[in-house]
Amino acid sequence: MLKKILLLGLSLCTMFSFVGCTNSTQTTYEKVKEKKELTFAMTGQYPPFNYIDESGELVGFDIDIANAIADKMGVTAKPETIAWDGIITGLTGKRFDMIIGSMAITEERLEKVSFSNPYYYDGAQLFVMQDSDIADINDLTNAKVGVVTGTTFHSYLSENYPNLEILQFESDVDNLRALKQGRMDALVTGKFVGLSAPSKYGINIKVAGTLLYFEEIGVAIRKEDAELLDAVNTALQDMIDDGTYEEISQKWFSTNILEK
């Protein structure tokens, strides 16, 4: 009797696999196509790449790129905000499908996740208040410098400038606010984020010195999701070829930030 029940269960699973028996074997790409929904994460606090505008809407360059990728794949993009220091854990834990949140491609991160081809180029830049006498990072001795926790900016300063007191913040919005309040001498963030701060937040800051280092920014995807990675790279190339990328980049920066 038990044998008959087991055989019946196996037969039913075979017959009705389309309703759930084999869902566990679906790839992320197959699930995305089936649901027609692509979930992606960012902090929502990294203007002008991803942030909440005055009307409470999540906007920015990353958001437009994500929507365009989803459109090329024939699905809808669904964003999710999360703190930066937990974003890779969220991805590997399958909380969302990918990270489209201005994440730099690094050797350390490549040990945990895969990355798409770069979708823009950026660099770490030191910023100070407009009335500061600091010309570059070599002028900082036992100074306080702000960074966002878990960023490449934090690890770079820790390794190369041990004499600095590094203040950590959850977001660039908090980082910029602290500099304006005089709680530190300088901050390090992405070049484009700092350059947009005066117009975006009315924070009167300026560049101090040249880029500390150059970064390639990519879409982060779980290592096992090779099919999804291929689809994202194809979508990005299509966007470049048909002018979609140029249009988005010009909208936010008045230049093509994929050009070095």
Indicate residue ranges for each PLM-predicted region.
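C-terminal motif of bacterial Sec signal peptides marking the signal peptidase cleavage site
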Residues: 17-20
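Flexible hinge/capping segments at coil-to-helix
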Residues: 29-31, 128-145
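Periplasmic-binding protein-like
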Residues: 44, 121-128, 195-237, 255-260
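Extracytoplasmic small-molecule ligand-binding "clamshell" domains
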Residues: 25-102
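Short loop->beta-strand "edge-of-pocket" segments that line small-molecule binding or catalytic clefts
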Residues: 36-42, 137-150, 165
